[in-house]
Amino acid sequence: GVEFRMNVEVGQDVQMQELLDEYDAVFLGVGTYKYMRAGLENEDAPGVYDALPFLISNTYKVMELEHNQPFIDMAGKKVVVLGGGDTAMDCVRTSIRQGASNVICAYRRDEENMPGSRREVKNAKEEGVKFMFNLQPLGIEVDAYGKVSGVKVVKTALGEPDDAGRRRPEPVE
């Protein structure tokens, strides 16, 4: 059988060696506790959400667990998710499942260079997510009330590889 030990701090509540001695296999689901910011103008505007709080609030709602943060609901909204990794795929698919009216995933490179799982991208497309490639976000556009109204982007083309060997997206006119 499988035993789940949630909210357990390895090294404090249980020692790693104890787990290794007691079980044939150990999965540590440490999660992502630090979310990244893009440094875009107006990224703190109302209507802009960070991936991690969005996904966490959805998980608590689906599992009917109490949570001290508000539920972030995309029902009926037009959603743009910036990025091409698995977290972005989680966000677009969650938005679709919440009933968003339109979901777009904008990524700065082409589809072949997305870091996310091919299966996740395929599933997102099947669920109705639209993809826009070679678009680098420059900033968040806001209305007269300071609420998000769009995303300013520039078209890109792949240039020379970066230090990690991935071709850099470079703005094109």
Predicted region positions:
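Glycine-rich dinucleotide-binding loop and its adjacent helix/turn
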Residues: 2-5, 35-98
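A Rossmann-like FAD-binding core segment of flavoenzymes
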Residues: 1-36, 62-70, 97-173
